[in-house]
Amino acid sequence: ALVLRHFLPLLDKQGAMAMLSAKVGSIGDNHLGGWYAYRASKAALNMLIKTAAIELARSKPKARLLSLHPGTVISPLSQPFRGASAARPADLAAAEMLQVIDALGPEHSGSFHAYDGQALPW
């Protein structure tokens, strides 16, 4: 919330701002349970992004505020949970998310997308 408060006023009228969320923050895609605090924090972040995007559209209708899921990225945090999933290097995840940001227009402001551009359910 503090990042949005301080940086949204600086956003160009056609600019984009993306926040890192996670697929586990999706209520509609929760089929495994667990991770209560992490899921709740990412779901709250998604609500914050959606709400702020509505308000941003009033003053900067061509700007974009997005919630992005980077996928499983190789890191100490993901190490215990990777299992059979294919974790990707952080630089690849970042490059893919930049492509998603560039591909999404203002009509997608406030939306939740994965690194491959797939729209994710709230």
Language model: regions and residue ranges:
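Conserved active-site helix of classical SDR/Rossmann-fold NAD(P)-dependent CH-OH oxidoreductases
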Residues: 1, 43-54, 91-98
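Short, conserved SAM-binding segment of the class I
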Residues: 2, 6
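Catalytic loop of short-chain dehydrogenase/reductase
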Residues: 9, 13-59
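Conserved beta-loop-beta element that borders a ligand/cofactor-binding pocket
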Residues: 20, 59-71
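Residue-level detector of flexible, active-site-proximal loop/helix-junction positions
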Residues: 24, 72, 119
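Short acidic/His/Gly/Ser-rich catalytic and metal-binding motifs that mark active-site loops
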Residues: 27-29, 74-77
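C-terminal helical subdomain
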Residues: 63, 67, 75, 80-122
